[in-house]
Structures are given as structure tokens and as C-alpha cells.
Amino acid sequence: MKKRKPFITTITIVMIGMTIGLSSLLFTSCTSYTPTEKDLPVTTLTELQTAFPKAMYVEMTETATYAVKNAKGKVIGTVLLSSPYSDDINGFNGPTPLQIALDDKGKILEVRVLSNNETPNFLKRVVDAGFLESWNGLTAKEALNKEVDAVSGATYSSKGIQLSLKARLEVLK
């Protein structure tokens, strides 16, 4: 009997911990919060503020879609993540997930490459060529119809980015 007591105590502690963790998770998913890399793959709030200077909160509204809110809680834009919609699209060295910032009228403000396995030199060529700015100012529909030439010396990387962007915009409501 004495050997079972520590086992039961351990099980009880684990169950209490799981209950607290689940409650915390449910509470967090039902409220607005300041994004962190752990909670939200949109880099950091400071970096998000390059597209949305007045951004104070981000709230998930549906799969890979986040409402960006100002201090008063007003939606000032949207952030779209290309993953999971583009997970099967490869650049030079695997998928290249994107963060796409849209203003409150649905125009693209910024396309940002998230953590990936692309060769840094190829990705640098894409960024330096201004490739990511090719869709700025366009609506999703306009961006879907725009063909952008691949960056010389980084063809696979740039095509992967373009296809990932289009895959995400195709499912935008």
C-alpha cells in the first residue's frame, strides 16, 4: 500500500498541472494578446509595427489569419501566414513561409519571409532585388493576377515565395 501512495500523488499532481495548463490555454486563446514568437509566428510586435505603426494587439480570427488592433481595440489591418496553405511549395531548400500584412482596405503593406531553410545568399538576393515589395499596394485579387519575374541567381527561392504568396491569397475570404 505504501508504494502506491507516491504513484497516486504523482498522478494527482500531473492531472492538476494539466488542468491548469489547459485552462490557461483556453483563456489565452479567447482573449487578445501581444504577440510573441512563441505564441504567434509574426516575428515581434516591434517588427509588425513597421507595417502597422499603431499596432498594439493581435488576435487570431481564423486559421493563419490575425486581426491587428490599435490601443482602442479597433482593427487596423490583417496579418496572413502562408503556412499551412503553402507547406508543400518549395523554394531552393524547402518551404518558405511568409507573413503578409494587409491594411484595413485589404491592400498588401508588406510581405515578410519567416524562419526557413533557404540558403541565406539566395534569400539575400531576393530581398536586395526588392522582390518582396512587388505586391505592395495591391489587393489580394490584383496580387494573384500579377506575374513577377524571378530574381536572377535565386530563381527557385523567388518562385517559391511567389507561389507561397499566391497559395495563401487564394484562400483569403
Predicted regions and their residues:
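Bacterial N-terminal signal peptides
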Residues: 12-26
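N-terminal secretory signal peptides that target proteins for export/translocation
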Residues: 1-8
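Detector for methionine-enriched segments
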Residues: 1, 15-18, 56, 60
